[in-house]
Amino acid sequence: METLTKPEMTVSQKGDKYKVLNVTGAKGAQMPAHISTKEAVVVVLQGEAVLKLHGKEIRLKTNDSAIIPAKAPHTLDIGAHFKADVIMENDSEIQFINP
């Protein structure tokens, strides 16, 4: 059975309404199917990844951004060392679909 390497996520900032998650991952890391309970914005700081959302593959690279709707299942496959900030409301949670 293949071991899945997930990107690391840490909260770097938290304000009155929003928080910023730092997401980092090595080439080949994958974030399995999950949702955010509220809308989220991904801003790529470094690297490349493929966001699979609504049946489409969205190629993300440095300086790209994407808006992920609330409760929309999606995955992230990292193609090159990856760093991104994800901005979401403080009470938003990431929930994996098949943990």
What does each model-identified segment do?
Residues 1-29:
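A short glycine-rich, His/Asp/Glu-containing loop-to-beta-strand
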Residues 36-50:
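Short, conserved beta-strand element in jelly-roll/cupin
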Residues 45-46, 61-62, 80:
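A cytosolic small-molecule/anion-sensing beta-strand core signal
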Residues 52-56, 79:
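Short strand-coil-strand connectors
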Residues 55-70:
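Short acidic-glycine-tyrosine-enriched beta hairpin
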Residues 70-94:
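Ligand-binding loop in jelly-roll beta-barrel domains
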